[in-house]
Amino acid sequence: DLTEAANKSNEALRLAKQESNDYRRQVQALTCEVDALKGTNESLERQMREMEENFAMESSSSQDKIVQLEEDTQNMKDEMAKHLHEYQDLLNVKMALDIEIATYRKLLEGEESRISTPLPNFSSFNLRETMLELKPNIESTFTKKVLIKTIETRDGQVLNESTQNHDDLE
C-alpha cells in the first residue's frame, strides 16, 4: 500500500508539475502577448500624436492661407475700385475733350464760311492743347472776345503754335 500511495503521490506530483509548467508557459505566452500589445499601443499612440501635430500644423497653415487669400481679395477689390475710378476719370476727360473738339469744329466751320477761303488740310495734325476764353467787352455786353490758342503737333513734335483773337464770333 505504501508503494501504491507513493506512486499515486508521485503521479499527482508529476501532474501538478506538468500543470504548473503548462500554466507557466501560458503566463509567458500571455506576458509576451501583453508586451506586444503594449508596444503596438505605444506605436499607435505615437502615430496619433504625430497625426495630431501634423493636423495642427496643417490647420494653422490653412488658416494662414485663408488670411492671405482674404488680404489678396481685399487688395484686388481695392485695386479694382482704383482702376474703376481712374477709368471713370478718363471717361470724363474723354467726354470733355469730345465736347471741346465739337466746339472747335463748329468754330472752324463758322470761321471757314465767314472767310470763305479753304483752310489747309488739318487731318495730319493733332491738336494738343487748346484754350477757349470768353471775355466780355466792357463797352458793350453784347460783344464777345474769343481767344483761340492752337498748338499743332506731328508725331509729338510741336510744328506751330498760334494765338488768335476774335471779336464778336457768333
UniProtKB/Swiss-Prot annotation:
Q: Where is this region: Coil 2?
A: 1-111
User: After translation, how is this protein modified?
Assistant: One of the most prominent phosphoproteins in various cells of mesenchymal origin. Phosphorylation is enhanced during cell division, at which time vimentin filaments are significantly reorganized.
The stretch of residues making up the signal peptide is: none
The GO terms describing molecular function are: structural constituent of cytoskeleton
The tissues in which it is expressed are:
Expressed in low amounts in retina, optic nerve, and brain and in higher amounts in spinal cord.
Ranges for the region named Tail are 112-170
Q: Does the keyword Coiled coil apply?
A: yes
Give Gene Ontology CC terms: axon; cytoplasm; intermediate filament; plasma membrane
Looking up PROSITE patterns in the UniProt record yields: IF_ROD_1, IF_ROD_2
Q: Which InterPro entries match?
A: IF_conserved, IF_rod_dom, Intermediate_filament
Gene3D superfamilies per record = 1.20.5.170, Single helix bin
Q: Which UniProt keywords apply?
A: Coiled coil, Intermediate filament
Compositional bias (Polar residues): 1-10
Annotated region Disordered: the residues are 1-20
| Biological-process GO terms, alphabetical | intermediate filament organization
Looking at the record, the residues that make up the IF rod domain are 1-115
PANTHER family xrefs: GLIAL FIBRILLARY ACIDIC PROTEIN, VIMENTIN
Task: Please describe the quaternary structure of this protein.
Answer: Homomer.
Described by its record, this protein's role is as follows: Vimentins are class-III intermediate filaments found in various non-epithelial cells, especially mesenchymal cells. Vimentin is attached to the nucleus, endoplasmic reticulum, and mitochondria, either laterally or terminally.
Family (UniProt): Belongs to the intermediate filament family.
Q: Return the protein name.
A: Vimentin A1
What species does this protein belong to? Carassius auratus (Goldfish)
